[in-house]
């Protein structure tokens, strides 16, 4: 209460800032660690930009409006004029919070600060928004987002913020894609990757109307209108990993039917304990330690040892009615022609075509979903005259665009995930690479596990030089972090080098400095 006889909640140090919620009889009602308390007005100074709760017309009061960008690309500037320097840009459809207007310009919150955009390219939403902070024990209403965010962050208990019936910020939780959406680089705004509807991403923080997220160790942002925030305290289901009898299983949640679909990935990392559930936001660090599935992160130029007959035998035992039975020789032939792993090629075809039974596979002899875009898969898919033609064509395309370091969609020559490898741009399904790798594991297990962990895997650091041979100079340089398969170590007077499988099919092997590779544990 507002008197000296009330119990003490805590104390404030000289210079600390507080949010004043009200004033009466010489006392200020303030927010203190998520609760309300009182301090004497004689010991605080109210700044000129403060909100005066006793005077709603106080010019310091921030009245917020929400608006949607109505331009293909809208520059955000330091000041309210076209002569002011651009500090970033907004994409069409993004939502912004307007905190002021001046001469046809809107002052908005942007990247944790403020910026200006032309009002003519904004569509202002009708009505004013209020913000409700929700905890397990209370709900607090606030007139603007900044104040609500500050109060939530100061709370010791878990909390989230709702506005217009939608969660707009939270202390912890995950983010679910409302449809196929892009993830953007926080600094440049460049598209990093994309994910399918229903994909769950780890929540990092909300910065204005952009939500920072993580997937497979990569951080980027998504537009708040493209996702739904699920605070931990609401208990919404999501995907997870678990182990059983030494094997690792992925329980993938489907929000449309409320059920988990399960598949075995391969051997379980030794640090995981049976009976525990592990979050599924980073495939490489399940349980907080290295959990690289070998076939998912092995460069696909590492050839397999299987014959066409062995592939057919696997198909026959796994799915006796599969139309793919008898095509083993074509997968091996294409793999040899384009220097790629035959186990990968057939596993990719199995996943995309449903063991050869899909309508696209049956009608168009297209086993790889080539050109089967998310918006219209069947009509978009390319047709081929024979199975052999389809396999050869798609292998050539993958070789040129995804496995070749000079390819336009090269992100590392392995299946990978949403941070690196083919999965970055080949498919919106964030588990696409993992599912193909799980099939590769099954083929290998049926053939005596001859290829599993044949090479030690590592991450080659971006900018590292690559050498054609130990006798010749540098032949290239990595533009990004990539996975490598180490054949052997070569010690020289100049230092240690690794001979690695080359992503460039012109060479069987290339060499890199051992110090530029971070070794990882695979299973």
Language-model segment annotations:
Residues 1-3, 69-80, 138, 181, ...:
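Short, solvent-exposed loop/edge segments of extracellular or virion-exposed proteins
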């Amino acid at each position: 209460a507002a008197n000296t006889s009330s119990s003490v909640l805590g104390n404030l140090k000289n210079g600390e800032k507080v949010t004043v919620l009200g004033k009466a009889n010489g006392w200020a009602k303030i927010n203190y660690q998520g609760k309300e308390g009182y301090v004497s007005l004689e010991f605080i100074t109210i700044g000129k930009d403060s909100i005066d709760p006793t005077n709603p017309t106080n010019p310091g009061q921030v009245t917020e409006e929400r608006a949607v960008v109505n331009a293909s690309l809208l520059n955000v500037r330091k000041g309210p004029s076209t002569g002011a320097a651009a500090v970033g840009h907004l994409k069409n459809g993004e939502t912004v919070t307007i905190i002021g207007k001046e001469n046809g310009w809107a002052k908005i919150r942007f990247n944790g600060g403020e910026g200006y955009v032309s009002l003519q390219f904004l569509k202002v939403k009708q009505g004013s928004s209020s913000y409700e902070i929700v905890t397990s024990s209370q709900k607090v209403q606030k007139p603007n987002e900044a104040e609500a965010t500050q109060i939530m962050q100061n709370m010791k208990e878990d909390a989230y913020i709702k506005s217009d019936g939608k969660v707009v910020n939270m202390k912890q939780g995950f983010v679910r894609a409302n449809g196929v959406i892009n993830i953007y680089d926080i600094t440049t705004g460049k598209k990093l990757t994309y994910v399918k509807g229903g994909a769950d991403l780890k929540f990092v923080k909300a910065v204005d109307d952009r939500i920072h997220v993580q997937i497979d160790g990569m951080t980027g942002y998504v537009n708040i209108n493209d996702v739904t925030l699920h605070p931990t305290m609401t208990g919404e289901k999501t995907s997870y990993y678990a182990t059983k009898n030494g094997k690792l299983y992925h329980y993938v949640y489907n929000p449309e039917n409320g059920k988990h679909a399960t598949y075995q990935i391969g051997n379980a990392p030794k640090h995981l304990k049976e009976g525990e559930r592990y979050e599924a936001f980073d495939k490489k660090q399940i349980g907080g330690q290295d959990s690289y599935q070998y076939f998912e992160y092995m460069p696909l130029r590492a050839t397999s040892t299987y014959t066409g007959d062995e592939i057919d035998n696997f198909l026959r035992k796994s799915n006796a009615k599969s139309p793919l039975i008898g095509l083993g020789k074509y997968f091996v032939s294409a793999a040899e022609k384009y220097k790629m792993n035959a186990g990968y090629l057939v596993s990719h075809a199995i996943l995309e075509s449903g063991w050869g039974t899909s309508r696209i596979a049956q009608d168009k002899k297209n086993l790889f979903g080539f050109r089967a875009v998310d918006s219209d898969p069947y009509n978009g898919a390319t047709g081929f005259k024979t199975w052999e033609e389809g396999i050869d064509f798609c292998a050539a395309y993958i070789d040129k665009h995804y496995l070749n370091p000079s390819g336009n969609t090269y992100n590392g020559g392995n299946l990978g995930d949403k941070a690196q490898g083919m999965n970055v741009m080949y498919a919106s399904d964030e588990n696409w690479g993992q599912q193909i790798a799980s099939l590769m594991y099954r083929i290998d297990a049926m053939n005596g596990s001859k290829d599993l962990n044949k090479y030690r895997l590592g991450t080659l650091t971006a900018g590292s030089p690559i050498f054609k041979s130990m006798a010749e100079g540098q032949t290239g340089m990595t533009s990004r972090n990539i996975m490598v398969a180490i054949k052997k170590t070569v010690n020289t007077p100049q230092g240690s080098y690794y001979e690695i499988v080359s992503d460039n099919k012109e060479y069987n092997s290339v060499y890199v400095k051992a110090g530029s590779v971070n070794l990882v544990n695979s299973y």
